[in-house]
């Protein structure tokens, strides 16, 4: 009887740890696009930054991301070590001159974002990140807010 409570407690913890049974990202701090039971790594890159008056333009090389999805409300998984899931923001690029660009200004544009995200903690360091609204076809990037220019790019077609 003396051991019954600790055994029940440990059993409860083991069951709770196994709640999420889906795929798990192989690398930390990388966003993976979920397609059924498959994980597709997003295009991880560093955006170059250029500032003019009230505008800041972020640029990524290439007219299109090689990572594509037909889903208007894509779902991503993140195994977090350095990147905090709640700092992620979703933006839409404009394609100009063979490059993807995002210009942020004091005059906010709902067309480029940030778009609403829903973030759900699945496990100790595992998060589900999903667009909380239907997105139009185009080029997009998830990026942690702050001083980083890291961009996790994908295309909706």
Residue ranges and their predicted role:
Residues 3-13:
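Sec-dependent N-terminal signal peptides
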Residues 8, 141-143:
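Alpha-helix C-terminal capping segments
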Residues 18-102, 146-157:
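Primarily secretory-pathway and cell-envelope proteins
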Residues 74, 115-116, 125, 150:
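Residue-level marker for the onset of beta-strands and adjacent loop->beta junctions
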Residues 98, 109-111, 137-139, 150-151:
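A short local loop/turn or secondary-structure capping micro-motif enriched for an aromatic residue
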Residues 102-124:
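Extended, solvent-exposed segments with strong compositional bias
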Residues 118, 128-130, 153-155:
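Generic structural detector for well-ordered beta-strands
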Residues 125, 131-141:
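A glycine-anchored, Pro-Gly-centered beta-turn/N-cap motif
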């Amino acid at each position: 009887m003396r051991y019954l409570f600790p055994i029940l407690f440990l059993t409860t913890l083991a069951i709770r740890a196994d709640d999420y049974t889906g795929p798990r990202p192989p690398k930390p701090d990388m966003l993976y696009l979920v397609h059924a039971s498959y994980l597709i790594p997003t295009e991880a890159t560093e955006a170059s930054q250029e500032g003019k008056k009230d505008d800041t333009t972020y640029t990524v090389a290439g007219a299109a991301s090689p990572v594509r999805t037909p889903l208007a409300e894509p779902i991503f998984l993140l195994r977090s070590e350095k990147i905090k899931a709640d700092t992620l923001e979703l933006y839409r690029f404009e394609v100009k001159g063979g490059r993807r660009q995002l210009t942020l200004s004091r005059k906010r544009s709902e067309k480029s974002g940030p778009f609403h995200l829903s973030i759900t903690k699945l496990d100790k360091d595992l998060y589900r990140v999903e667009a909380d609204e239907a997105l139009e076809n185009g080029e997009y990037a998830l990026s942690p807010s702050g001083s980083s220019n890291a961009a996790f790019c994908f295309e909706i077609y």
